[in-house]
A protein has these predicted regions:
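Extended, amphipathic alpha-helical stalk segments that mediate dimerization
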Residues: 1-193
């Protein structure tokens, strides 16, 4: 009986050792996968950034001149590095707020894309996202607390979404918790009817 017990114990120990080795291999494989995935995502981000930079360069000269000290045009690297700050996002929003009537719709669309891209990229610096884009939905009732009405009606339904707003997110205790905006830094720009 003790002979059989020793064999079973030896077999069990071998299985445990084998299981532990496989867990270590799986963990190493997952780390490699995460690294490759991160590199792939980073390459995708660079391709998107390059496209946005090229589209930015194609904008009207008059529009680009409004952003010349904010989104640097000297080269791709300057453009990219200039976008990774909340002050840049605030400045873009402030200019659009004042100049939206003088910005052609196709350029406004490109600026929205650039703004969204940089907000999303800034989130990648953190384990959990720190910022959220805020949009407005057409035909919903205007909310003066969470939206900025460029038509100065300050009531009625939203007729046009002009530009994103953004806010900071609450810290999460659990990564599966829903994102909750803690503070609105810039409200979405809208026109009401």
């Amino acid at each position: 009986m003790s002979e059989k017990y020793k064999e079973l114990e030896k077999s069990n120990n071998e299985l445990i050792k084998d299981k532990n080795e496989k867990e270590i291999k799986a963990e190493k494989l997952m780390k490699k996968y995460e690294k490759v995935k991160q590199e792939r995502d980073s390459m995708g981000d660079l391709l998107v950034a390059r496209r946005l930079y090229n589209e930015y360069l194609e904008m009207n000269t008059e529009v680009k001149s409004k952003f010349k000290n904010i989104l640097l045009q000297k080269d791709f690297e300057s453009f990219l590095s200039s976008g990774y700050s909340t002050s840049t996002m605030d400045n873009i929003w402030d200019i659009v707020k004042v100049e939206y009537k003088n910005i052609p719709s196709e350029n406004l669309e490109k600026l929205r894309e650039i703004f969204k891209f940089f907000i999303m990229q800034m989130n990648k610096k953190f384990k959990d996202p720190n910022f959220a884009l805020i949009e407005a939905t057409l035909e919903e009732e205007f909310d003066p607390v969470t939206q900025f009405d460029l038509s100065q009606n300050s009531r009625g339904k939203i007729a046009e979404f002009i530009f994103y707003g953004y806010g900071t997110l609450e810290d999460k205790t659990n990564s599966k918790d829903e994102d909750i905006i803690e503070k609105i830094k810039k409200r979405p720009l809208v026109l009401t009817k």
